[in-house]
Amino acid sequence: MGLSRKEQVFLALLGASGVSGLTALILLLVEATSVLLPTDIKFGIVFDAGSSHTSLFLYQWLANKENGTGVVSQALACQVEGPGISSYTSNAAQAGESLQGCLEEALVLIPEAQHRKTPTFLGATAGMRLLSRKNSSQARDIFAAVTQVLGRSPVDFWGAELLAGQAEGAFGWITVNYGLGTLVKYSFTGEWIQPPEEMLVGALDMGGASTQITFVPGGPILDKSTQADFRLYGSDYSVYTHSYLCFGRDQMLSRLLVGLVQSRPAALLRHPCYLSGYQTTLALGPLYESPCVHATPPLSLPQNLTVEGTGNPGACVSAIRELFNFSSCQGQEDCAFDGVYQPPLRGQFYAFSNFYYTFHFLNLTSRQPLSTVNATIWEFCQRPWKLVEASYPGQDRWLRDYCASGLYILTLLHEGYGFSEETWPSLEFRKQAGGVDIGWTLGYMLNLTGMIPADAPAQWRAESYGVWVAKVVFMVLALVAVVGAALVQLFWLQD
Ligand SMILES: *[C@@H]1O[C@H](CO)[C@@H](O)[C@H](O)[C@H]1NC(C)=O
Ligand SMILES: *[C@@H]1O[C@H](CO)[C@@H](O)[C@H](O)[C@H]1NC(C)=O
Ligand SMILES: *[C@@H]1O[C@H](CO)[C@@H](O)[C@H](O)[C@H]1NC(C)=O
Ligand SMILES: *[C@@H]1O[C@H](CO)[C@@H](O)[C@H](O)[C@H]1NC(C)=O
Ligand SMILES: *[C@@H]1O[C@H](CO)[C@@H](O)[C@H](O)[C@H]1NC(C)=O
Ligand SMILES: *[C@@H]1O[C@H](CO)[C@@H](O)[C@H](O)[C@H]1NC(C)=O
Ligand SMILES: *[C@@H]1O[C@H](CO)[C@@H](O)[C@H](O)[C@H]1NC(C)=O
């Protein structure tokens, strides 16, 4: 046996083309990598001081691609141990100390020479908004404590501030659209282009104490107090945004409990949103301390109530509806609930934070229709507590609340914001967009550091990731073509 001389030559050619093609590919990769990874990476840190906890986000980008051409990525997301800073009313200093652990974790990832050049921000949201209403001197003490700790850490600390609900909504919207590349995009032809406005997505955020809805409506925004304007990459955007204080998940759960206690005061509270067979003791005092609760505990009640789950989704939905004032919108056009103006919904929406966490647990993040979502949550609410508890042994402190928060989200989106069976498919439940966690923090940092310029960049023609990918793809195609041609030739001869 043996190959003919012709076949040997062809095999040799084939091998050679394969090897040289591969070499070219490797060279291209090495060259491109050295272009894409210059030594100077910049960093930025944002603390998201929410009502239930604080998170640290570390972002990084290339120093030579500032002013809009850079792509910011997330290098670290760290959950601060302990509760939100607004809980440290009796020991403000500890609120500052609690941030140390995550900060140290972030500093490990940043070269020491750059520590002092790393812009660091702390933004507080609805938890502190509520506290400063209730007792502004306590809120001031807490801000002073976190400012002191971050001010003496080896970073470039820009300050701690209370974010208004509108800013929280707007920055969440910027984060989503920046992550998705719907504000500006690098095209295959090597130009920066502006995607059509229909590509912009709305943002639905739900924290512990407040919830935000932000989108670009199709028509004018009639209530100017709900309008936020900004200029990004040379385009003007007018978004509708509203933040509902006391409609975050945790405050909603407290208000729900109080509503049930008030409507039927008794030492044994039967809770329709807790699964049947669930039982616990509830201390009444702390429940009524929330600034979102405007009632006093019935005098006839003991300090501690026994709470029993009944797993009744119908009764649960009725109790949840009591948290909304739908009648205040009756007869008014473009009104959501509690008398709040809302223009007609438009386009795609990303629902994140507690929207995502709740629906992720319930396996409802894969674009199920509204009827399936409803049926799934109702089915979950009717499961016996014993079975559910056994499936998730001690791993989830929110386990008893998923029925309530699932039905709450459904009520808010469907009856509150007005998503119907037809518009429900425009909702995506997501945690991330373009590799970054969705929240207000990235949009906030981009804005404060001026990394999204108001004007369109003049010369945006640097090597981009998209072009690099295209090059690789074309090289691979070329390689495949060469090999294919050689193979055809080879088999053709053997015929
Ligand atoms: C970005 O813009 C600022 C001022 O707008 C300028 O000082 C800086 O040099 C610019 N950076 C780059 C890399 O072009
Ligand atoms: C606010 O808190 C401080 C200290 O905890 C307390 O002395 C003060 O009475 C509180 N003020 C109000 C209005 O509750
Ligand atoms: C209420 O419950 C707490 C523990 O949850 C307990 O420390 C307290 O003594 C109880 N109070 C009364 C009046 O039973
Ligand atoms: C609902 O809003 C209307 C109009 O703002 C008000 O008159 C009514 O008292 C509210 N209902 C409740 C239950 O708060
Ligand atoms: C979600 O799906 C997983 C895997 O299919 C399953 O184990 C889990 O029980 C489901 N969760 C709920 C709440 O039904
Ligand atoms: C959810 O399902 C229940 C029971 O099947 C039904 O009564 C209710 O109207 C449904 N809700 C929605 C929003 O479809
Ligand atoms: C971004 O920051 C500038 C000041 O640097 C401010 O005027 C502007 O309103 C901010 N944008 C948004 C959306 O808040």
Swiss-Prot record:
Query: What activity regulation does UniProt give?
Result: Not inhibited by ARL 67156.
User: Which PROSITE patterns does the record associate with it?
Assistant: GDA1_CD39_NTPASE (PS01238)
Question: Where located?
Answer: Cell membrane
Q: Known InterPro entries for this protein?
A: GDA1_CD39_NTPase (IPR000407)
The record describes how the cofactor is bound as: Ca(2+) or Mg(2+). Has lower efficiency with Mg(2+).
Q: How is it modified after translation?
A: N-glycosylated.
Q: Which reaction does it catalyse?
A: a ribonucleoside 5'-triphosphate + 2 H2O = a ribonucleoside 5'-phosphate + 2 phosphate + 2 H(+)
Q: Name one GO biological process term.
A: nucleoside diphosphate catabolic process
Cytoplasmic-side stretches of the chain, per the record, are 1-8, 493-495
Q: What cofactor does its activity depend on?
A: Ca(2+); Mg(2+)
Gene Ontology terms: cellular component: plasma membrane
Q: Name any one GO molecular function.
A: apyrase activity
Q: Is Transmembrane given among the entry's keywords? A: yes
> Which CDD domains does the record cross-reference, listed alphabetically?
ASKHA_NBD_NTPDase8
Does the keyword field hold Glycoprotein?
yes
Extracellular-facing ranges: 30-471
What keyword terms does UniProt attach to this protein?
ATP-binding, Calcium, Cell membrane, Disulfide bond, Glycoprotein, Hydrolase, Magnesium, Membrane, Metal-binding, Nucleotide-binding, Transmembrane, Transmembrane helix
Q: Where is the catalytic site? A: 168
What does the function comment of this entry state? Canalicular ectonucleoside NTPDase responsible for the main hepatic NTPDase activity. Ectonucleoside NTPDases catalyze the hydrolysis of gamma- and beta-phosphate residues of nucleotides, playing a central role in concentration of extracellular nucleotides. Has activity toward ATP, ADP, UTP and UDP, but not toward AMP.
Protein's name according to its UniProt entry: Ectonucleoside triphosphate diphosphohydrolase 8
The gene for this chain is ENTPD8
